[in-house]
UniProtKB/Swiss-Prot annotation:
Taxonomy of the source species: Eukaryota, Fungi, Dikarya, Ascomycota, Pezizomycotina
Keyword Hydrolase: yes
GO molecular function: beta-mannosidase activity
Main subcellular location of this protein, as a coarse class: secreted
Official protein name in the record: Beta-mannosidase A
Length: 914
């Protein structure tokens, strides 16, 4: 008999049993949770965390409430034991007084053979899984004289220190957007597997690699070559000599069989059986990211057989046919001739096509993964699709995402840039640590390789772009040493492991790099990074940019010019409704102790519970930004004033992201040939100030609505140099063919009256924008305009054009609206727009009308206990204009009564006392 488990959480393969196997899901057993910190036991669950079981038992309040991240520190600082008994033939980590094994990596899959222990067990078996205190363990490792010590000021501690010594979710120890619960417990399922004595196997993991013949990870695949399928199964048990393998591909929609054949070149190495076949003469329908084509998927069944065609293993996975390639090659002569600046590329190509990556960074959606459900993630990914995003960067260090999350991405066409779990720190490079990492890398690369949504493997977060420069600045005499350690871990160890287990995915050693100079897989350091070997006037790599000086937030000259933007942003407050989920009514004001201490920007840097100095800096950044650009809320009711301030911080955040995204998208037609914008960050882990566009629970901030608008296929954008007064209008398109149309320019005062002679600008301007490109359609200077009062003026830009979507012969009409004001919003001579809101019970849509003036930042809001999003929000509405808006309900706990609580406001409301 065999007991299969993954990491300290005891996760195991969930492949069904065959040929007399008996697989027992330990999630169905009765568990108890105990600790010296308690004087009694409570019911436990698997999977679970100690916090969740203590909450369910009524021992603690909601960990997310108030300052419970501080109040409940006794939980992560204690040891916990999960126990189950009265199960015959059960094999524990500690069983019948016998030690079975210890695990030290949350990210690995473990299996333990306990047959001999079972044979000698003369009592009722008890399975006991002990979880030590993660903060205490890493501190003990740090104090060991044999542990590495890094120069002062290098390692980034957010709350609990020394996280880099443990292969556990790094944000469990705290981050600048989340709490430090450091939870303990069996966070994934576990199983008991009993195999017959005859030759038999149980599948642990499956690697399905689908690529073009001759494809190599860092080189562009030849799209004319046939597809190759490499199927590899990891197992426990024993295979007979000379096993056979076969595959079958079946269309998930039609059920039509694409191909069914035996695989040749079957080899058995250790506990893996592998076969490779070329799909000659087979033309599958391709899988495309969102907006570029259909998400065609196939079920692939791999069967392993022995003598007399006896089935030994049978695995079915859902997959798709696509190539995805990160192009970091040098700029070619042909590109130079097109006006692209010299240097190196840094963009993605899918099925041989360049495309613009539009998206954000996803962080852990909860501090406690066992309560993250497929339905919850489906709602989040539906919001990603609704937000016109085709790529998410899966930030490290959270976890390697569950397969069901990749499944959701496969279905929706969301590319997942994935990373190994290292972030903002230097890590050990001793042999034991590297061996542990090697097993982690191999398991996870093989596990998710069949998903067409998988876009990239990156070595870690900001290691090359932040950590190495920090060493160079603070400990220059040790810079060479730590560059060597960086290359030892991320290039000499991880890169070959990736290449050995997939040919379909590119690897980059860090999330942000200047790219590579050379790749030689036979060299001790197989990838030579560029580092400082750059040439002025040339562009390389991707950018990671933050600037919390809000005085330059709308100055595009401070934005980095690069080939791809993988991180940028600014924090804001969540809405009142979200705060009310976690904060008592008396704490609902901007500078309350609870609100301030839930803000972890800037982090405490230790286990301090009085981080008022650092958090006040982050709160101050939001406050100053609002004061610089927007009407300052001053409502008589304290809760209403708090809500207005929260909303104001979201307005600034959204406008700043809009400015930066427009700049990056315009770069697609500039010398830098910029082809990607992934802002920080998609969603929240809890209710607190952060960079998120979607709050904990699913409510959209202003940011997600605005990014959805500016991520449309064809957009018109104003670029204003407020120092010189220059105003340029650009049209940007991410279509694969040219598009043409016109942009209407309409100058109005804020009462909605057209300005005489349209303020000296033409009423409309034609455009013809190239494929994946941008074009300037108009240029002027504010001084040349005939504006009676710049504070009482708005330019409304309305685009209408035609073009073809990628992989479509149908001509499509595209529209987009934008606006420009000659002064910042706080200086505008606002008027009451006289907003009216109605609801049509038949069409289930809302109608908003402005009766008396221009409505800026028109904002529809909905009450608590419902989750969803409006078709449009944060828009400009002109007098007499009616806009019909639908609402997508994702979750409703009000029995439809939420409709009665929908409200509408505009920037004008931010100036009112009530």
């Amino acid at each position: 008999m065999r007991f299969t488990a993954t990491a300290a959480a005891l996760v195991a393969s969930s492949i069904p049993a065959t040929l007399g196997q008996h697989v027992r899901d330990l999630s169905n057993e009765k568990w108890t949770l105990s600790s010296d910190a308690l004087n009694h036991t409570v019911p436990g669950n698997l999977p679970s965390h100690a916090h969740l079981d203590l909450l369910k038992a009524g021992v603690i309040d909601d960990p997310y409430h108030g300052l419970n991240d501080f109040n409940l520190r006794w939980i992560p600082e204690s040891n916990w034991t999960y126990t189950t008994d009265k199960i015959k033939d059960l094999m524990p980590i500690e069983f019948c007084g016998k030690y079975v094994a210890s695990t030290n990596n949350q990210y690995r899959q473990y299996s333990f053979d306990v047959s001999q222990i079972l044979e000698g067990c003369n009592e009722d078996p008890i399975l006991k899984i002990d979880f030590g205190s993660a903060p205490n363990i890493v501190n003990a490792i740090a104090e060991d004289r044999n542990s590495p010590v890094w120069p002062d000021g290098i390692q980034q501690t957010y709350e609990y220190p020394n996280r880099w010594f443990m292969r556990k979710e790094q944000s469990d120890f705290g981050w600048d957007w989340g709490p430090a619960f450091a939870p303990a417990g069996p966070w994934k399922p576990a199983y008991i597997v009993q195999l017959p004595k005859a030759q038999n196997i149980h599948v642990l993991n499956t690697d399905l690699d689908i690529y073009r013949k001759g494809q190599i990870n860092h080189l562009p695949p030849d799209q004319s070559q046939p597809w190759v399928v490499n199927a590899s199964i990891d197992f426990v048990g024993s295979l007979p000599p000379n096993p056979s393998m076969s595959i079958e591909f079946k269309d998930t929609k039609s059920g039509e069989i694409l191909t069914s054949k035996r695989i040749g070149n079957v080899t058995v190495s250790g506990n893996s059986v592998t076969g490779v076949t070329v799909l000659g003469g087979v033309t599958p329908k391709l899988w495309w990211p969102l907006g570029l084509g259909d998400q065609n998927l196939y079920n692939i069944t791999v069967t392993v057989t022995g003598h007399q065609n006896q089935t030994l293993a049978h695995v079915t996975k859902r997959t798709g046919f696509r190539t995805i390639f990160l192009n970091q090659r040098n700029i070619t002569d042909a590109q130079l001739a097109q006006g692209i600046a010299p240097g190196a590329n840094w963009h993605f190509e899918v099925n041989g096509h360049e495309f613009y990556a539009k998206g954000s960074n996803i962080i852990p959606p909860d501090a406690f993964w066992p309560r993250v459900t497929e339905a919850r993630m489906a709602r989040l990914f539906d919001a990603v699709v609704a937000g016109n995003q085709n790529m998410l960067r899966v930030w490290s260090s959270g976890i390697y995402l569950h397969d069901f999350i990749y499944d959701l991405a496969d279905e929706r066409g969301i590319l997942l840039w994935s990373e190994f779990e290292f972030s903002d720190a230097l890590y050990p490079v001793d042999d034991a640590f590297l061996d542990n990492i090697a097993a982690e890398v191999v398991y996870n690369v093989r596990r998710v390789n069949h998903h067409p949504s998988l876009a990239l493997w990156a070595g870690g977060n900001e290691i090359e772009s932040l950590m190495l420069p920090t060493v160079e600045r603070k400990a220059p005499e040790e810079y060479a040493k730590y560059v060597g350690e960086y290359e030892k871990l991320y290039i000499s160890l991880i890169l070959p492991l990736v290449y050995q287990n997939t040919r379909s995915i590119t690897y980059s050693p860090s999330s942000t790099t200047e790219g590579y100079l050379d790749v030689d897989l036979s060299a001790p350091v197989p990838m030579v990074e560029r580092y400082h070997n750059t040439t002025p006037g040339s562009y390389y790599g991707d950018t990671d940019f933050y600037n919390y000086d809000s005085s330059v937030s709308f100055n595009s000259h401070v934005y980095p010019v690069g080939r791809f933007a993988n991180e940028f942003g600014y924090h804001s407050m969540p809405s009142l409704q979200t705060w009310q989920q976690a904060v008592d009514p008396e704490d609902l004001h901007f500078n309350s102790t609870t609100v301030m201490l839930r803000n972890h920007h800037y982090p405490a840097g230790g286990t301090f519970t009085d981080n008022f100095h650092n958090t006040s800096l982050g709160m101050g950044e939001m406050t100053i930004a609002v004061q610089r650009y927007y009407p300052i809320p001053n409502k008589l009711d304290s809760v209403a004033n708090f809500s207005a301030w929260c909303h104001a911080t979201q307005l600034f955040q959204a406008d700043m992201y809009k400015s930066e995204i427009q700049f990056y998208r315009r770069g697609s037609g500039m010398p830098e040939r910029q082809l990607g914008s992934l802002y920080w960050q998609l969603e929240d882990i809890w209710q607190a100030p952060s960079w998120a566009g979607i709050e904990y629970g699913g409510r959209w901030k202003v940011l997600h609505y605005v990014s959805r608008d500016i991520y449309q296929r064809i957009i018109v954008s104003p670029f204003w140099n407020y120092t010189t007064g220059d105003l340029d209008l650009y049209v940007t398109s991410d279509l694969w063919e040219s598009a043409k149309g016109k942009v209407n320019l309409t100058w109005l005062d804020l009462s909605g009256t057209p300005l005489p002679h349209n303020a000296g600008t033409p009423g409309s301007v034609p455009f013809n924008v190239g494929a994946l490109n941008t074009t300037k359609i108009y240029s002027t200077n504010i001084k040349n305009l005939t504006l009676p009062n710049p504070k009482d003026a708005i330019l409304v830009l309305s685009l209408s054009g035609e073009g073809h979507l990628p992989n479509s012969d149908k001509k499509t009409t595209f529209t987009h609206q934008n606006h420009f004001t000659p002064v910042f919003p706080k200086d505008l001579a606002l008027v009451d727009p006289g907003l009216e809101l109605s609801y049509n019970t038949k069409s289930k849509t809302f109608t908003v009308e402005a009766k008396s003036g221009v409505s800026l930042y028109t904002w529809l809001d909905y009450p608590a206990d419902v989750v969803g999003y409006f078709d449009e929000n944060a828009f400009v509405l002109l007098p007499g204009q009616k806009k019909e808006i639908g609402f997508t309900v994702q979750e409703d706990n009000t029995d439809g009564k939420w409709v009665q609580g929908v409200t509408v406001q505009s920037l004008w409301n931010q100036t009112l006392e009530k």
